[in-house]
Amino acid sequence: MKLLIASTLTVLLGFSPIQLDPPTWNIDKSHTSVGFTVKHFQITPVRGAFTDYDVDLQFSPDDLENSSLNVTIDVNSIDTKNERRDGHLKSEDFFNVAEFSTITFASQSIEAVGENQFVAKGELTIRDVTREFELPFTLLGMVENPFQEGVTVAAFQSEFQIDRMDYEVGQGDWVADLVAAHEVDVELLVEVNAEL
């Protein structure tokens, strides 16, 4: 009788005896990319990417309050298909990887802003500068993996622009935007999987 009463009260009060956190998703790097584009001489888009990164994602569209996103990028992995330019970008003139080897984003909240559209609000750190940042992203879809029973695959896309000077990426003569524009377009394509 006591168990029946307790169960009834649980239902009436809207509480579930088991509270499940959003799933932890595992990144599939073979289907993920971290890319960026910067204009050269204000006219020519030059594309690059970071090839070493980690994404820690706990996410459920139905439980955004407990969802979180943390990203760590190894700046040493920068690749613009030009070894000399990559070395310069790693130098004190730009990222100064000897002292600041990672770019990090840590969410403090995730909000829905439309159908399958979300914004992760948190802090972005580049070099030794940390600023509040809103990272928009789209849930492209979720499907069951036909080759792995019980495994769900999800895909996300994020496109945004940052001003490199907000993070002091450009010292001395490289503060000017004649050669390398201040505006950097970033595109993230992320595929993850989890056992749901």
Map each language-model feature to its residues.
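Low-complexity, acidic/polar, glycine-enriched regions of mature
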Residues: 15-196
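Sec-dependent N-terminal signal peptides
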Residues: 3-13
